[in-house]
Amino acid sequence: VVGGGFVAAGDGHDPATEAVVCMSRRKLIWGAQLATVLLCALALKFYYSNATANELRWILAPTTALVELLSGRSFAFESYTGYMSSDHRFVIAVPCAGVNFLITAFLMLGLRRLWRDRLQGISWTFLPMTAALAYVATLIANTTRICIALEIQRRSLEVNGLSGNQLHRLEGIVVYFGFLLLLFMLSERMEAAKPRTALLFPLAIYYATTLGIPLLNGSYRQGMPFWEHFIFVLIFPLVLVAILAFFVGAALRGRPWLNLASEGPHFFYFGLVSAPPAPRPYK
């Protein structure tokens, strides 16, 4: 009651207070989403470290089906072993499941989305969508890697200075990290002024999952085998990023119309330029 009359409760609201409350709520939800992404990745890593081939058929079976389709080879499942080729020369086992790539892709997509849209608010639906996209990308990348490995085995290919295990490791690094970069570029909008800097993000995620976690787990106690793996993983992805950054830089230098700094922020979508998306209401 004001001055003997009634005033609607909504007439006394404070826009500044409402904005602060809304921002605080948005930060809490963003923090919960970040924690969920990290916990999902850790849970999957723990599950994979103890899983058998029987427990990984959800990813081994579709991968093997795609490999059979593309390579013409046939495989049969053997309990607790994996999918054995008909000539018993190749097995798609637990280490071939691609779960580490799945974790890396999920982290890269999830963390990048959270960071990029941290001021706008993100619907929780981005989590299952990110997981589904990472799963599909894993099937494609893993199928490609296994088909290449089968072809290397069939042709008995050798590289001077590399053992069979080293060649297999190099092939896996190039295929997996190459697909990670491709996935990043297909899902990312990069500012025209900093397209090469953005490529450091997938590299950092890849290093964290392939080098950081093994170091924390004490894998370095294995001695020389671990440090050989460490050097391969450290050097070759960096080389791939440097090559891609060179070509991206060359493409931008060859297209001066992409330099739009004087016209405000724009985004670079696979060679196309558009204005940034309008801010979305929080959902």
Located regions from the model:
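Hydrophobic N-terminal alpha-helices or hydrophobic patches in metabolic proteins across all domains
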Residues: 14, 18-283
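Acidic/polar hotspots within intrinsically disordered regions
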Residues: 4, 11-13
